[in-house]
Each structure stands twice: as structure tokens, then as C-alpha cells.
Amino acid sequence: MKKVLALVVAAAMGLSSAAFAAETTTTPAPTATTTKAAPAKTTHHKKQHKAAPAQKAQAAKKHHKNTKAEQKAPEQKAQAAKKHAKKHSHQQPAKPAAQPAA
């Protein structure tokens, strides 16, 4: 790889490839008599993966309500019924007068 890169650089500089090849062959190659220490055995540690939480809607992530398990949803009402609460009168309807038995 280095030789290829050097050839490209030499060609870009305008040097002849023959002169460049002569320079590279005269450099001594590293001897194989040197021994390298064996690389230490690496241990791979596995990460503990947590269970993925259940997916929630975006609004549910932001707004946490304290709701009871048995709380019922309120009845749906018309918009006018929400605005105008009716007042209940506590008057009982008048009873007809009792007729004496004849």
C-alpha cells in the first residue's frame, strides 16, 4: 500500500518510475529474526441489556396523571350542557285534592 502511494506521489512530481524503483529496491527489508511477543488474550465482556419499556404515545410520556385503577371516565355531554348547568327546582308538583268517598 505504501509503495502504491509512493508511486502515485512520484508520478505526480514528475519523477521517472525507473529511478523510483531503483531507490525502493536498495532499501534493506526488515529481518524476520526479531520475535514479537504474543498479544495478550483479550476478554470480551457482555453488556447487560435491559428490557425495553412498552411504547407510549408522546403525550403519555410528558403528562403523568395520578389515576386510580377503578376510576371511571366521565359521561360525554354536549357542549351546551357543559356550559349551562341546569338548576333543579325542589318544588313538588301539587297533588290533586282528595275527593271524599261518595
UniProtKB/Swiss-Prot annotation:
List the induction conditions.
By high environmental acidity.
InterPro entries of this UniProt entry?
Answer: Acid_shock
Renumbered to this chain, the Basic residues biased-composition regions fall at 80-90
A single BP term in Gene Ontology: response to acidic pH
Q: Does the keyword Phosphoprotein apply?
A: no
Q: Where is the signal peptide?
A: 1-21
Q: In which family does this protein belong, per the annotation?
A: Belongs to the Asr family.
HAMAP family given in the database record: Asr
The protein, known as: Acid shock protein
Protein source organism: Escherichia coli (strain K12)
Record lineage? Bacteria, Pseudomonadati, Pseudomonadota, Gammaproteobacteria, Enterobacterales
- What is the primary gene name for this protein? asr
